[in-house]
Amino acid sequence: MRDSETAWLDLEDPVVNRVAERCVSLTDRPLKNCEKLQILRYGSGGFYKPHQDTFSDTEGNKRMYTIILALNDDYEGGETVFPNLRRKYKLNKGDALFFHTLDNYELMTYKALHGGLPVKSGEKWICNLWVHKYPYN
């Protein structure tokens, strides 16, 4: 499914908080609806097969938005691909990729199916922020 390394950063950290606040300003939800910031490192050959970011839980607090931030761009391959849209994106350092995971705030949308193509050389570093419908615990 995935070949990467992961770390989680607490939103209470002042620097992390500023990054998350900027990201969440793209949405109609407050910071308290966000998960911790996820940092990912994909080494050479690292990938993530196409998947959906949202899921349903017993309380219906689904992930509504995904924000991917590019921390570097000195690698080959590793594009973020949306197979159902026939699109792929190679982000530059500092770029953000923002997309809705739900259609009409309720149903999973086929448009949000995405993955990471294999890194051909170098390391790909990104961070993800997921914003939920309701406050996230």
Where are these regions (language model features)?
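Fe(II)/2-oxoglutarate oxygenase catalytic core
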Residues: 1-137
